[in-house]
């Protein structure tokens, strides 16, 4: 995948320690940072599927995980899911 690719990050609502279910981006910060570091433009898109994060490149889902499995906050450099997502985007056609 060329650098500066457009990536659509689709994310669903999730519940956090007694708080109501809603769309939050706190757990996406590391993933956003990793993709931005590679020069990708990331568009956020809310979806209704609970606990889901999907990365789409050229209309194809190249990565999917449970949003609760991503580390809360941070730069994403130590999060293995962020590394996996980065590689999936770089390998996308």
Curated annotation (Swiss-Prot):
Belongs to the UPF0728 family. Pfam families: UPF0728 (PF15092). This is UPF0728 protein C10orf53 homolog. Disulfide bonds: none annotated. InterPro entries: UPF0728 (IPR027885).
